[in-house]
Amino acid sequence: VQNLKEMIVQYRNHPSIILWGVRINESPDDDPFYEKTNAVAHKLDPTRPTGGVRAIKKSHLLEDVYTYNDFLHDGKTPGCDPKKKVTSDTDKPYLISEYNGHMYPTKAFDNEERRSEHAIRHANVLDAVAGQEDIAGSFGWCMFDYNTHKDFGSGDRICYHGVMDMFRNPKLAAAIYACEQEETPVLQITSSMDIGEHPGCNRGNIYILSNADSVKMYKNDRFIKEYRPEMSLYKHLKHGPILIDDFIGDALEKNERFRPKHAKEMADAMNIVARGSLNHIPKRLYPTALKLVLLYHIDFAEVTKLYTKYIGDWGGTATVYRFDAIKDGKVIKSVTKEPVNGIRLQAEADHTNLTEHHSYDVALVRIRAVDAHGNVLPFYQEPVRITAEGDIAIIGPDTIALQGGMGGTYVKSLGRSGQGTLLLRSQTAGEIKIPFQVTV
């Protein structure tokens, strides 16, 4: 109870707080104790409701809001339970206090399938919650990776539950949330388009994550298709993930011997196979295959050749994909995917004017290794040497290894006004300098 008092008195003037948690995390019911904690919270702050993180359904509700950790979703199950299955009082508000998290821990340096699935699972839950009008909202677990105890982590005591790493570098899943705002343009593609990253060289499902009015897709500067938000299967999200279902456009009609109607049928079939495998063609495509065989005397060898040419991206010149996000008729952001032909460091400090008051000031510096188009290189794990010059110092080691192509460091002031420079060096990605101004 004393801990609760101290928490509320210390933080009640923060406008970002919407609710006080007055239960011990995932604890069983204890009515006498929780009657006291609720009374204390309402006395010290009558303006905010109370809740408490639960791992049990239909428990005693002494708080204003029933809060529950809903970890139902495992990739195939529904995104969330309906309110009536969880709360013991359907007349009171219901809030999902955690979801995902340990159900699918994902590292920034995991393979592409896992990083993409991580993002899609967050979208699945968000869409499911948005479709339930009697659920007040939800909190994903969680925003950042964090250090933990012996029972979690991957042998390293790090919980990889975040949509960002510990230095606040975004994983792919962070874009799911970024898409739901309108101020900053967002455009992410869930694949690097490198076929060698995938089993059998099959890329599987690839999604566009964007908050634009539309996204135009080009392959080697040839227009393929324009994608719009209403094409997303996530009907309860304003800007849900959009499945890329066309890698061919009108190329078969223009370049091959098929008539327009049959070219489209062939392209549709190849695009479906592209998300699976040429060795496991869905039975629903058999009628199309039979028709093309009878009309054009096409055999499996020719099909394989066409697939390799238009889907597999093998053997020819390097394929370049470009995606243009359109807002109000203008291109607001572009993403280009092609085989990596250059690596460089990219770094950003959360602020470069350090100001001391009662203690030294600290700035977080995020570090990334990117290709020529600014795409993070998720398998770049090389060391970066960090040097501080002038009136600043580094907090932490002077050499770090990037993880998932990302990392970070902290810089602090030294108690004197002046200037400083942070120098980042990599043997394979060059160097970068960040200037700092210090005021005491």
Mark where each language-model region is.
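Short, well-ordered beta-strand segments
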Residues: 161, 222-226, 379-391, 434-436
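Beta-strand-rich structural segments
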Residues: 206-210, 361-378, 421-424, 434
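Catalytic cores of secreted or luminal carbohydrate-active enzymes
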Residues: 142, 147, 152-346, 375-377
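Substrate-binding/catalytic cleft of secreted carbohydrate-active enzymes
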Residues: 1-206, 221, 226-231
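Extracellular Ig-like/FN3 beta-sandwich strand-entry sites
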Residues: 316-320, 362, 417-419
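Extracellular/luminal low-complexity segments enriched in Ser/Thr/Pro
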Residues: 310-312, 408-415
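Beta-strand-rich domain onsets/edges
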Residues: 203, 341-372
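Low-complexity "stalk/linker" and mucin-like segments enriched in Ser/Thr/Pro/Ala/Gly
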Residues: 235-246, 390-406
